Amino acid sequence: MDFVQHALLTASRGALTMSLNSSLSYRKELSNLTATEGGEGGAVSEFIAIIIITVLVCLGNLVIVVTLYKKSYLLTLSNKFVFSLTLSNFLLSVLVLPFVVTSSIRREWIFGVVWCNFSALLYLLISSASMLTLGVIAIDRYYAVLYPMVYPMKITGNRAVMALVYIWLHSLIGCLPPLFGWSSVEFDEFKWMCVAAWHQEPGYTIFWQIWCALFPFLIMLVCYGFIFRVARVKARKVHCGTVVTVEEDSQRSGRKNSSTSTSSSGSRRNALQGVVYSANQCKALITILVVIGAFMVTWGPYMVVITSEALWGKNCVSPTLETWATWLSFTSAICHPLIYGLWNKTVRKELLGMCFGDRYYRESFVQRQRTSRLFSISNRITDLGLSPHLTALMAGGQSLGHSSSTGDTGFSYSQDSGTDVMLLEDGTSEDNPPQHCTCPPKRRSSVTFEDEVEQIKEAAKNSLLHVKAEVHKSLDSYAASLAKAIEAEAKINLFGEEALPGVLFTARTVPGAGFGGRRGSRTLVNQRLQLQSIKEGNVLAAEQR
């Protein structure tokens, strides 16, 4: 019986050893087959592909980093997240991708174990930080579009710095476990780089995907979903407003022209407005789909590959699919400067100005040095493809072409910096009655939002100082009166009523004011009674002693 059990155990061990050896030999054969498949043409095509990816990642992110760094007014709070995103992608192209290029040529890792672990950590860290930064940018745009008036209070400089620090700490927590025993780091001959051994610890693979990929992806879906819903609602409101305006204009013009021509022109304008707003709505939808679609296309295949490896083993994925899924994740670093950098009108025009010299600057940037907190808000809104009309309504103002009829505040827009810069200005319904004109409104103010805030702060500071001065003056007066009262009481206690000046017992009456005279006499009597009671109390106290 023992002999049979020993034989079965030996056979099972032998089968396991054979399966492991066959697995290793199978992967080796696949590697050799992949290397020899297509001859030198396949190796050359892979080399050219990874070289192109590396160059595009490096140049694209470097251009955005330099543009934002040189033009300080562009480095708003929102663009600080973009700056961090592109800078991390640039570091990926410098510290990781060159070694991937070398490994794709040599078909092995030649840089040692230490650098293998370090490059794997860098790849995971930068990739995780990039995905989390996309989620933070979505939150920033959410507040800019849905709550533009409280955006400067919600998204502050300190909170932006704290968000960036949190992004990197969050990413570091998700990337350190392979260096401390939960999973491990290995050179993957089909990814041509050192990565975490996703097939060894399925638990870590699922943890990293949820912690660093699924979490920001859900944030993006929720935030951009709310943004698009608000854009649709505001577009309907603007469209209804234009219909009312057209009808009123038609009624006015009907008094001068025939009703037939008026109705036809009104219907044409109404149709034109509907086309414009539907186009803006489609542009916003396209922008959101591009942002989310780029994330899914670049990172989706890689997530599917590592999930398959974690659940069904290393050999379940085709080597070619594994290679291209990994390299497709590198292309996300190409999409980021395009979507979050060049998609921005202001950044794009500044970049063209840097490339084509001062002539382009003079034509496009007359007031490019003006800075504003609401410049950042408008950037976030217009980057989503929303029209100035929608931007005005989302900020709580009126559509362009309408003046405020309720009016504490109104909004006008300027294209000075290549985007819709929002300017806050005052208006009243009495001085500015509502007018419906088809011509574009004139710019009524060039005062920036920060200037308005500074003026309000100065006025509040002056009023606060005035109130403090009045309070101190009242306190000083009260203290002086209290001191005189204490002094009078002390004199009464020591010297009696005769020591006090006679003016205290003289009632001030105003001639012709009978009520004031009677009130003064009653006050005098009350004072005498109080002094008499005090004096009698002092005498009784002396007799008792």
Curated annotation (Swiss-Prot):
InterPro entries: GPCR_Rhodpsn (IPR000276), GPCR_Rhodpsn_7TM (IPR017452). Keywords: Cataract, Cell membrane, Cell projection, Cilium, Developmental protein, Disulfide bond, G-protein coupled receptor, Glycoprotein, Membrane, Receptor, Transducer, Transmembrane, Transmembrane helix. Glycans are attached at N21, N32, N117. Residues 68-80, 140-159, 227-285, 344-545 are cytoplasmic. The keyword Electron transport does not apply. It comes from the Eukaryota. It holds the Pfam family 7tm_1. Disruption phenotype: Embryonic lethality by 10.5 dpc caused by increased Shh signaling and ventralization throughout the developing neural tube. Defects in Gli3 processing. GO terms for biological process: adenylate cyclase-activating G protein-coupled receptor signaling pathway; negative regulation of smoothened signaling pathway involved in dorsal/ventral neural tube patterning. It is a multi-pass membrane protein. It is found in: Cell projection, Cilium membrane; Cell membrane. GO terms for cellular component: ciliary membrane; cilium; glial cell projection; neuron projection; recycling endosome. Residues 1-46, 102-117, 181-205, 307-322 are extracellular. The chain crosses the membrane at residues 47-67, 81-101, 118-139, 160-180, 206-226, 286-306, 323-343. Disulfide bonds join C116-C194. Belongs to the G-protein coupled receptor 1 family. Key negative regulator of Shh signaling, which promotes the processing of GLI3 into GLI3R during neural tube development. Recruited by TULP3 and the IFT-A complex to primary cilia and acts as a regulator of the PKA-dependent basal repression machinery in Shh signaling by increasing cAMP levels, leading to promote the PKA-dependent processing of GLI3 into GLI3R and repress the Shh signaling. In presence of SHH, it is removed from primary cilia and is internalized into recycling endosomes, preventing its activity and allowing activation of the Shh signaling. Its ligand is unknown. This is G-protein coupled receptor 161. It comes from Mus musculus.
